[in-house]
């Protein structure tokens, strides 16, 4: 650090309002956050375009990986394992979607701009699946997907709330 001349201010030459904190506040612009939301929705929809047998084969790979954990928990029925993997997949991909939606409001509180896509995207996803060979759209999956969105929004909102509390 260069020596400061007598009578000179440490803040001389800094722009007004500039942070003196050495850690930078790296905020992702709102448009970029919405772009991530849109990209994740496209990812979800792309997964729904796989025909039934291919989707089942992908789930079987995950079941094989998780089989030791299932068996340790006493779950030995392969059909039940597949069902749990598929439903957990629904919930988790929509929890990520909800978390991304939760990152979009500037004030940290989700509003209609987050809730509406959180309802439309799962509904469109299940509708899309009705037109894919070997797939079906189910209302129970829409409900599970919406629960995942709500969970993601809840977690993101909670994290933002805690961060805001400790910033003060």
State what each model feature region is:
Residues 15-20:
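Short, low-complexity intrinsically disordered segments enriched in A/P/G/S/L with frequent Arg
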Residues 91-108, 147-161:
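Membrane-interfacial alpha-helical segments at the cytosolic side of multi-pass membrane proteins
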Residues 3-5, 21-95:
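"…centered on the first transmembrane helix and the immediately adjacent amphipathic helix/loop
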Residues 122-146:
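Interfacial helix-loop-helix junctions of multi-pass membrane proteins
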Residues 82, 86, 95, 99, ...:
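Active-site alpha-helix of zinc metalloproteases
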Residues 40-47, 118-126, 153:
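Alpha-helical transmembrane segments of multi-pass membrane proteins
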Residues 29-32, 107-115, 138-139:
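Membrane-helix interface segments
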């Amino acid at each position: 650090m260069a020596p400061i001349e007598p009578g000179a201010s440490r803040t001389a030459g800094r722009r007004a309002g500039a942070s003196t904190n050495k850690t930078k506040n790296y905020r992702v612009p709102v448009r970029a956050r919405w772009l991530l939301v849109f990209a994740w929705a496209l990812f979800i929809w792309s997964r729904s375009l796989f025909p039934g047998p291919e989707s089942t084969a992908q789930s079987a790979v995950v079941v094989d990986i998780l089989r030791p954990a299932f068996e340790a928990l006493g779950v030995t029925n392969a059909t039940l394992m597949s069902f749990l993997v598929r439903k957990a997949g629904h919930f988790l991909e929509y929890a990520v979607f909800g978390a991304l939606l939760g990152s979009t409001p500037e004030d940290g509180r989700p509003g209609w701009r987050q809730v509406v896509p959180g309802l439309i995207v799962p509904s469109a996803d299940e509708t899309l699946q009705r037109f894919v060979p070997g797939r079906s759209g189910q209302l129970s999956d829409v409900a599970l997907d919406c629960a995942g969105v709500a969970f993601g929004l809840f977690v993101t909102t909670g994290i933002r709330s805690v961060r805001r509390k400790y910033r003060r």
